[in-house]
Design a protein with these regions (language model features):
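Carboxylate-rich, polar loop motifs that coordinate divalent cations or form catalytic acidic clusters
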Residues: 1-182
């Protein structure tokens, strides 16, 4: 039983990883991801990814997101790691340390990253899956008329419209084509 795994008492995030035929579980208070799969009538622990092996001060996993190219993004309390589609290991993206609340992919392949108190970032992903400062655009209440900088969740709909829910009770959209907030 997984109840005997001490660091799995509180799970912060979970995702299916079909290419590996496994499920990933993020530990709330440890820099670890647990890899599991269901075998007949029991859940089997396949192994642990210690995030400290991939980044200095990696933080704890909070959000898993798979993009259209099957790269698996792991937002932590300290930044973002990624598992490239054809790789086994995670790598550090060099995203600045901030409180990340959501990740979504735009129609153009850029990533949208919601944050608590710092608005939303639009990130051009380099070929080696890192973020460079020149490829990061920060949208805020001051610069882009967002309704709130305190973003709780984001998603991108089929038309490319970004939806945001704030931790102040607001729901609003941003259209990357027209740069309009509604």
């Amino acid at each position: 039983s997984l109840k005997n795994v001490p660091n799995l008492r509180n799970i912060s995030c979970i995702i299916s990883v079909p290419l590996l035929n496994e499920i990933w579980l993020g530990s709330e208070y440890y820099p670890e991801i647990y890899r599991v799969k269901k075998e007949k009538d029991r859940i089997e622990l396949l192994g642990t990814l210690n995030l400290s092996n991939y980044a200095d001060n990696p933080g704890f996993p909070r959000i898993f997101y798979e993009d259209s190219k099957h790269n698996l993004w792991v937002a932590t309390t300290k930044g973002i790691l990624v598992k490239p589609e054809k790789e086994k290991n995670l790598q550090d993206t060099k995203f600045p340390s901030m409180d990340i609340t959501g990740i979504g992919e735009g129609k153009d392949g850029t990533l949208w990253i919601g944050t608590r108190k710092q608005g939303v970032y639009n990130a051009i992903v380099s070929s080696n899956l890192t973020f460079e400062k020149k490829g990061l655009k920060n949208l805020t209440t001051q610069t882009d008329k967002l309704v709130s900088d305190n973003i709780g969740a984001i998603c991108i709909d089929d038309n490319g419209l970004m939806w945001m829910g704030s931790q102040d009770g607001d729901v609003f959209t941003y259209d990357p084509r027209t740069k309009k907030v509604e």
